[in-house]
């Protein structure tokens, strides 16, 4: 999903900066340990403020900035007048290093948005000391400013946004990693992701040791050569794809800061599927809830249902494999190895990248209590042919996903066994 947002205000200017890290540390990488929750991958490695306050941040490839749940509620500091009991937050009133930035960046409100849907997502701005492992910087924060009552606590206290940054973007909508790169806290603007999944009984999964016992690792400042398969990294330049805000991630006001790349071919096995010829076709990388499932069109999903002899099924809400609006279909669990891969090509003459059948089949439970295998496919778009889709957990299995903040490009590599 993209589960939370709650924001507040504060600001900027000339105040003591965070102490510089030693030179060798500035040039090294940091591995963010990731745990997989319903909303997506969260990390506990970041602290904010003085004295340092612990956080649990949602690492979100599709959010613009360093969003922080604060005490702000209806323009007061009555945090739990808006937040649900038990909600974790950053108490900005207790940080001696926080600086108000409302004079630099006006309050922003998005409605609709993909966190609170038709409730206001409002942010006010401040700067404070932000620590990622042993690295620290003074960053601009998006502080939550709620004007409504949350009905439940969200599983994190902020967002570690990782959207790409455009030249015209000021610090109020810049990813925290990008802000730290600009302050030379990292030698490189590269970041990489590996997924040590363990949700496919009967199949070989990456050892949790590869992720230091975690569900995933988001490496900041580069990538580990040991993870890259023998074919190396394929780099694809990102594109701005305006239809994303009409049918995929819908915000008002709109923004287009996504790791989106063009799709030039789409296959089921070796059978090519139709693309949209009017708008072109693209995918967005999102390893949170909107990125679950294999990205397919109405027509290609229908074809996969036919090939796999899948049958319509009603699933319990708790076991739905993704949050798409399409129907779900069950398949014979014993035939999974015979099903074709779902494939994509991201540029003429480039490699074809696959989601193997075992990666797009998920276990679920029917309304009458039966355990079934289902096609974990998510369909977005208008009309029959492929327009846009999101690639996340299912695509990331057995791959390394890289983002280059300095050149705005996506890198793909096989995850070395």
From Swiss-Prot:
**Glycosylation site positions:** 74, 91, 100, 170, 276, 314
Q: Spell out the PROSITE patterns in the cross-references.
A: PEPTIDASE_A1
Task: Tell me which UniProt keywords the record has, alphabetically.
Answer: Aspartyl protease, Disulfide bond, Glycoprotein, Hydrolase, Protease, Secreted, Signal
Read off the InterPro entries from this record.
Answer: Aspartic_peptidase_A1 (IPR001461), PEPTIDASE_A1 (IPR033121), Peptidase_aspartic_dom_sf (IPR021109)
User: Pfam families given for it?
Assistant: Asp
Domain spans labelled Peptidase A1? 42-413
Asked whether the UniProt record includes Cell inner membrane among its keywords, one would answer: no
GO CC, alphabetical: extracellular region
Q: Secreted: is it a keyword of this entry?
A: yes
Q: Which cysteines are joined by disulfide bonds?
A: 333-373
Q: EC number(s) on record?
A: 3.4.23.-
What is the residue range of the signal peptide feature?
A: 1-20
GO BP terms: proteolysis
- Annotated compartments: Secreted
Explain the purpose of this protein. Answer: Probable secreted aspartic protease that supplies the fungus with nutrient amino acids. May be able to degrade the selected host's proteins involved in the immune defense.
Q: Entry's PANTHER family?
A: BETA-SITE APP-CLEAVING ENZYME, ISOFORM A-RELATED
Q: Which family does it belong to?
A: Belongs to the peptidase A1 family.
Its protein name is Probable secreted aspartic protease ARB_07536
Organism of origin is Arthroderma benhamiae (strain ATCC MYA-4681 / CBS 112371) (Trichophyton mentagrophytes)
| UniProt lineage | Eukaryota, Fungi, Dikarya, Ascomycota, Pezizomycotina
